[in-house]
Amino acid sequence: MREIDLREYDTSGPFPLSPAERDTLGKIVAVTPVADTASEYTLTPGSTVGALEVGDLSVRIQPKIGIPQLLSLACYAIGKVKFQETDFDFPEHTALPDALAAALAAAARRAFGRGLLHGYRTEEEALHTVRGRIMVAEQMRRRFDLLLPVEVRYDDFTDDILANQLVKAAALRLAALRLRSRETRRRLAWVAATLDNVSLVEFAPKDVPKVEFDRLNAHYREVVELSRLILRHGAFETQRGDVRARGFLMDMNVVFEEFVTVALREELGLPDRQFGKLRVPSLDEDQQVRLEPDLSWWDGGVCTFVGDAKYKNITDERAPNADLYQLLAYATALDLPGGLLVYAQGEAEPATYQVRHAGKRLEVATVDLSGTIDGVLASIGALADRVRALRAEARRVRRAA
């Protein structure tokens, strides 16, 4: 199998590609023909990272930050689980699907060490013996003149519960990929075999259910949230003619936005309905121009803070004009004295812009993603202080008006 290793936002050297490979990769990365060649191209990934296979071609796209940092951020964003780098024990240049598979297998082994989690599930069946409660109405409707079978409802204590279904679905999704590590494939097979009696459920990426945790199932939290991450992100599959492509991809834009939102909400001690990506008024009075800021803080029906989280490849180390214009539109429509743009550190320098004739102050802040999850969350604490300050200013201005 041919292999191509790419890095987020970096342009590669030339590679020969077939038309099918070129067209399929063009859905994921920028493909540019090399002058004076018939079939050679340079490849430039955007914010999408991961790995995919196109026929006999294997392509790996590494993130700018390490994969342990990426997985720590993504797991915190999806379930507020604080994985440390030591929890992701794999070689530095491991492909993302292999890294996820190794992490899932390790988390499953820890969780299953106390035995498979069981729970009660309500079942309704027609049986020849009474179990649980007889559903009289159903019995009369379906079998008015028959004594057997009996329509019953009962609670079954089983391992075929949502938590195990999520883990099994995630393990089989990764196992369907061509993982590079034989040991990782073996560990995933062990996870699937352990869950052999659990139903295989298809979970849509946009509708992966949450599991409620308590003292009885807290030991499952890591493996469940890691499974939800796998199921929610990146299953990629397509076919062009005889060439089939599949892989696992994650959008760093989504990971960063979700992490900043969840981490700030936790630091500020606010519920989902009060802080995050919420519905805001339109820019114009006729409601023709919709606004969708990533971050807003609401006190009842009044917005007291607005901001955006941006994960971009910025070349001149300053916030792009378009981002500043967008933030100005948010602040204007919501009648706020200013707003905040949050970038990954290294993409834009912290700055403050006072807008002429508008009385608006636009602030730019950064979050360093390169350290441990505890270090990143510490920088979120400083960011939360800026959010509180902007909110306090907005409330002062409104009281003075």
Report residues per predicted region:
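Residue(s) in the substrate-gating loop at a strand-loop-helix junction
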Residues: 1-240, 244-246
